[in-house]
Amino acid sequence: MRNSIVYFCLLVCCITVRAEELKLWYSHPAEEWVEALPLGNSRLGAMIYGNPFEEEIQLNEETVWGGSPYRNDNPEAYGVLSEVRKLIFAGREITAEKLWKEHAFTKQNGMPYQTVGSLKLHFPGHEKYTDYYRDLNIENAVATVSYKVGDVTYTRTLFTSLADNALIIHLEADRPHSIAFEASYSTPFEESAVIASKNRLTLSAKASAHEEVPAAIRLESQARIKTSGGKVESDNGKLIVTEADVVTIYVSAATNFVNYQDVSANESKRVDVILNQVGKKSYRQLLDSHIGKYQQQFGRVKLDLGHSLASQKETPVRLKEFREGKDPALVTLMFQFGRYLLISSSQPGGQPANLQGIWNQHLLAPWDGKYTININTAVS
């Protein structure tokens, strides 16, 4: 009998470990950008901080770049090529280098990939909370945040749909009329505006100029709120939700980018088309179609390097203890996380993953977030 009990306990532990393996999970909110949870569908990127009181969802759209279509080659280069060769063969390398720099290069070094900004959700009264948990399930590309305020449990479920081209934010509470928050946009772009009307919040902006190349990319992001119970009001660039039972927020973004030499599209119409279609579906339909499409790609590869009880610990602890102990499942998790990031940042019909995949909080990212072919191609 004792052996049976031991076997049952070990079996339960193994089941728990397997269930947690392909999740990154944390017992605290993200304090900085690199700790936020990345969601993406190639076109849209989102970083989820998971703060109960002041949720920030930093947004990216794959075609938000500084500058505008331009030529980065110097037409004078060919004319000096012969002279540069002669100087090199004559042993005058310094002179050759100076001549080449003067006539082969331009003032531009490539345009920067830029952020859209952030959608912020302010929850009054949620400063003090308990039982906090957040995770990113890379088997279904869904992030979850849960916590308690008093005796009410709040849950946020977020995913960037591969099937429907939108970020879905689903808010629930286990007590009726308990959801109340303010939604607002922020952006670092100087030329920008935010309008709140009924259940819709709209951010419009123009990307920035760079290295004497004028700005041409226009962008728009919309957040539309649907509630069960309660009400939605607009006030001074914000949407205010009170006494709701369940809330779903549909978010998307688009630009006027058509291709590398054409920026003539209508970004507002693009966003409207996406969100009008999304609004026709239930939350469950959106979730199921997203998971189904994601798993068509993610499910192609399985990897099992073994299991250990370390899999039950939260991700930061596992990373810290990895050198000192055995956690083969963490290697599996990191391998699959790499696949998750590439699936989420590069899909057929979209732009290739850039130097930061699709996630970037800056107007001037490290190395501009550009396509550095010697690195991007090899690593991705």
Label for each model-derived stretch:
Residues 20-379:
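Aromatic-residue-lined binding/catalytic grooves and analogous aromatic/hydrophobic interfacial grooves
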